[in-house]
Amino acid sequence: MGELLIDFQSEGNGSLKETDRFVKKAGGAPANVCVQAKKLGCDAVYLTKVGADGFGDFLVATLESEGVDVSHIGRSADLNTSLAFVSIRENGERDFSFYRTMTADLYIEPADFEDVEFSKGDVLEFGSVALATDTARDTHRYLIEKAVKAGTLICFDPNLRFN
């Protein structure tokens, strides 16, 4: 559960200031975990919200093409899909710029996931990035409490970036 965003990855090395060509990719650390779990043969369901825009369409289609259950990805007509621009500097470090103000994945609500059920064999994976708003934190708490009651394993990725 959590952030699902477009990563615009630079085609060459250099800072974002120096880069002028990007390739659109599906991104978000928890989404990457979900896809890899599916490739390992696990059932995979993603819980989030994206904008009712072309970027959201691309992300849902990408996860669906990987076999991920997208039935719990909500769509918002009022909020955009999150975007990130990333390049690789000459020293190998990544250079990020995020566009996540008033984006759909930061405004998930418990009501979006009332029908989600967990069981003992499940894993609920989430990261710190999606905890940036009170609404998202409350929703994560709601889902974590449901998962813990069901005996689900909770996995936290402290993938915090300050930019």
Where are these regions (language model features)?
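Short acidic capping loops at alpha-helix termini that bridge into adjacent secondary structure
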Residues: D20, S71-I73, K120, G151
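A generic structural-conservation signal
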Residues: Y46, H72-I73, F156
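Ribokinase/PfkB-type carbohydrate-kinase core domain
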Residues: E64, E93-N163
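Glycine-rich phosphate/adenosyl-contacting loop at the front of the ribokinase-like
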Residues: M1-D69
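Short secondary-structure boundary/capping segments
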Residues: G14, A77, S87-I88, D115-V116, ...
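Beta-strand->loop->alpha-helix junctions that form or flank phosphate-binding loops
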Residues: V50-G51, S71-L79
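Glycine-rich nucleotide/cofactor/substrate-binding loop typically near the N-terminus or early
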Residues: S76-M102
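Active-site/binding-pocket entry motifs
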Residues: L5-G12, N91, A104, A130
